[in-house]
Every structure is written in C-alpha cells, then in structure tokens.
Design a protein with these regions (language model features):
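Short, well-ordered loop/turn and helix-capping segments at boundaries between secondary-structure elements
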Residues: 12, 16-20, 40, 123-127, ...
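C-terminal, well-folded lobe of enzymatic/effector domains
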Residues: 6, 170-213
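Short beta-strand-alpha-helix junction that forms the catalytic/metal-binding core
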Residues: 115, 127-153
Length: 213
C-alpha cells in the first residue's frame, strides 16, 4: 500500500524523469537501473526509485529549464499540469472549471480535452515586435486554460488581458504567476525579463511541489 510519503516520492520521480528526459535514448538500460533499485533496496518503492536517479536527474528544477523552446505538450507542461491539479487551480474566466476537469472533458477530439496551452505573450504580439515565433514557445510563457478562455484572449497583449480581469479572475490567474506582480514586464519590450521573472517563480513552486529542498 502506498502511503503519503511514498506517494510524494513517486510523484517526484515521475516528474523529474519527465523533465530530464530520463527514458529517452537507451530505454532498456534505464529501465533495468530502476528495476534493480526496486529489487535491491530495503526502502519503500518511491524512495528506492528516487535514490536511483543520477545526480543531474535528481537536482532541483532550475529556472533556465523553463526558458528553453519546448513543445506545447512537452514534459515541462506535463509537470506544470500536475502541479496545477495539485493546487486545484481553476480556469481564469470560469471559476467552476478546474484545470483537472478541463483535461477530463469528454467528447473533445484533442489530447488535452478542453484544456489548452495559452501563450501569455501571444505569438503574434512577439512577431509584430520583431521576435522569432519560436521565442513564444517556452514554458515560462505558457499557462494552462480552457479552450474558450484562450480563444477569448486571442492575440491580445498580456497587459490588456490583465486589465480585463476582475479581482477574482486575477486571483485565479495569480496561481499561475500572471498578474500585477509582473509589473511593466508585461510589455513586449520586456518579454525576456518577464520570462526570467516567471521562470524563477515557477521553478520555486515546482521544487516545493516535489518536496525538493
């Protein structure tokens, strides 16, 4: 039976192996490493798996890992999703819909259900400012929202989106580190600074979520 402590360790192992691409490449060798740890360790399964992580796999999540160009549903977004589900985070515009329930919506052909990745700085905003479109695709610029909310925001600038939110909606957005605390970093000319600012806060929150000192 998995207790709370072991569940925390398993969560850490799953998220860190995803973030670090542990199972890319020589998969059989990697699987054998963890199987051996489970067989030989006298500790509970979760702790045994975490102990078997290499030093670079087990380290804290760094802000720079959230600044690299990433697929919309890549490993970093999967970890962000797990964190938001644990926080019982909600859609910014619809308080009745949690991030978890959006992903579980039936009858929608997309892998994420009614949940989608929202670019805080829209791609059009950045390309209009002379940046390459790839610059938008980094986890530090991603938020998870409903498809309808994402469509509502469209290609509006983030400071315009923030102005349109009610106080309660701003609270829900604040869970994902979007809000007044960003100050004038929400202007397109400070995009890099915004991403660095938000990446630092996301990394801190994810490390706390995973129980990493």
């Amino acid at each position: 039976q998995v207790g709370p402590d072991d569940e925390q360790q398993l969560k850490r192992w799953l998220c860190l192996t995803a973030m670090r691409g542990t199972f890319q490449g020589s998969v059989e060798t990697t699987i054998n490493r963890f199987l051996r740890a489970l067989k030989e360790s006298k500790r509970k399964p979760g702790a045994a798996l975490v102990d078997a992580l290499h030093k670079d796999e087990a380290r804290r999540i760094r802000p720079d890992e959230l600044l690299h160009v990433s697929p919309l549903w890549g490993s970093a977004v999967q970890v962000l999703h797990a964190w938001l589900v644990a926080r019982t985070a909600k859609d910014w515009l619809d308080e009745d819909r949690t991030i978890d329930s959006l992903a579980r919506t039936e009858g929608i052909k997309y892998p994420g259900g009614d949940l989608t990745v929202h670019h805080i700085f829209a791609r059009k905003v950045l390309t209009d400012a002379g940046l390459r479109i790839e610059a938008a695709n980094r986890p530090a610029n991603f938020a998870l929202l409903s498809r309808s909310t994402n469509a509502e925001f469209g290609a509006r600038t983030p400071d315009d989106v923030l102005r349109s939110l009610t106080p309660d909606q701003r609270k829900r957005a604040g869970v994902q580190f979007f809000g007044e605390a960003a100050g004038d970093r929400l202007r397109h000319e400070r995009y890099e600074e915004f991403c660095e600012w938000r990446a630092a806060r996301l990394a801190e929150a994810l490390n706390e979520f995973l129980g990493i000192d």
